[in-house]
Amino acid sequence: MARHPARCLLLLVAALSLQLTGCSDDSPQASGKRTNTPPTTGSAASGPAASEAARSAPFSLREYDGPIDPGPHRLPLISWERSYPVDALVHVPPGFITPGGWVIDNGRNGPAYGDLMVYGDVDLVDTDPCGAGRNVKPGSTVRDLAQSLVDQVPHWATTPEPITVGGHRGLYVELRVPSNLSRCESGEFTVFAVDQVENPWYSAGPGSVLRFWIVDVDGQRVAVAVKVVPGRTTHTAELVHMAETARFVENSGG
């Protein structure tokens, strides 16, 4: 009789063990679910995952190609193998895409093209964007670059105006591209070049308006460039607003 309680106790322990094992198999850890862990971030090829929108850190468009989720995003200074101490931080509204590093109006109509790009260096300026001009070095300061654009013939640029972007002072210059580029050697209006690489020129098609906000960010000259075609680019106001409200943050390297 004394052995029966022990046997009952063993049976009770075994039953409890089986019950606990069953509960463990249904747990998130056992099934591979991680309820308290955000989903894996999307790769550069696939773009930001849904979790990116919920994170406080803006997503970098450095390597991403595709539609841009509305919200704050980092734009690298266009470099072609150069590195810079800062990124531009812009708040992108709906309706834009990126090929990796800058913002493009997502219009389906080719002539409606518009974009926003951020440059860290301008190595050469074409003295005659539509003819056989010389390529000159613009110097290293904000005023040097602005004046080089103004000096282009036949004087396409407006007089530089003082501006502030992201708390940094600079100059604003606007260029209006002729509607007829038939006399242009390349058929395009070539403004300036970045580095000595294949297709380094920043250029525009007929009738474009080019806007430049050139600022000094703690010793780094930055040119925020917006290209639109008046009456055709779908989101001109949004592109300009992104440029005017840009901020500059430390380069995160990604």
Where are these regions (language model features)?
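Signature of long, low-cysteine stretches enriched in small and polar/charged residues
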Residues: 144-213
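N-terminal targeting sequences that direct proteins away from the cytosol to non-cytosolic compartments
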Residues: 2-133, 204-209, 215-254
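Extracellular/mature segments of secreted proteins
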Residues: 31-32, 136-142, 191-194
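Short, basic/low-complexity N-terminal boundary segments at the transition from targeting/disordered tails
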Residues: 132-150
